[in-house]
């Protein structure tokens, strides 16, 4: 459940929220109102995280309302869509994300929501859709991001083991991250 991201990130940031960064690999902006699995990014901004140091990789254009897309833009959040990831590659997307999220040299938290992956890769993720990134790209992103000294925390979210396929591919992917 992606609602863990809020508490996990705050724990990583400690007293350094003003210089902190956030990188999400997620199909959704997570900018909903309230306290839910669709609101951790908004709640972190409300807590004081600078939205200009937030980078969202893998945003799916058809899984987000135009209101959330406009909100992300107006807040100054850097969005690298699935289409852009396909064009520039996951390595370049991660490099750009680290530069932006780490601009103030504060701690970075990474949120890996597996709904960023193609539905065929993560059948145990109810929000996954066709057209997402591959398991290899998600693993590559996790390795690239966590090799940076500013990345101090990472969460893996949205795996419902009771819904996985017979070969347990989602669970195995989560374990390999």
Language-model regions, residue ranges each:
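Conserved alpha-helical scaffold segments that buttress catalytic/binding sites
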Residues: 1-177
């Amino acid at each position: 459940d992606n609602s863990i991201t809020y508490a996990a990130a705050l724990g990583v940031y400690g007293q350094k929220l003003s210089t902190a960064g956030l990188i999400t690999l997620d199909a959704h902006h997570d900018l909903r109102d309230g306290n839910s699995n669709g609101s951790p990014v908004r709640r972190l901004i409300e807590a004081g995280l600078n939205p200009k140091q937030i980078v969202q990789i893998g945003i799916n254009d058809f899984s987000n309302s135009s209101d959330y897309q406009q909100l992300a833009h107006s807040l100054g959040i850097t969005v690298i869509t699935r289409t852009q990831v396909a064009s520039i590659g996951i390595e370049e997307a991660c490099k750009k994300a680290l530069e932006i999220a780490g601009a103030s040299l504060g701690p970075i938290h990474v949120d890996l929501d597996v709904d960023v992956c193609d539905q065929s890769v993560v059948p145990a993720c109810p929000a996954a859709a066709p057209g997402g990134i591959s398991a290899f790209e998600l693993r590559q992103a996790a390795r690239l991001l966590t090799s940076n000294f500013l990345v101090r925390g990472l969460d893996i979210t949205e795996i419902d083991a009771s819904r996985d396929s017979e070969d347990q591919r989602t669970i195995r992917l989560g374990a390999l991250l």
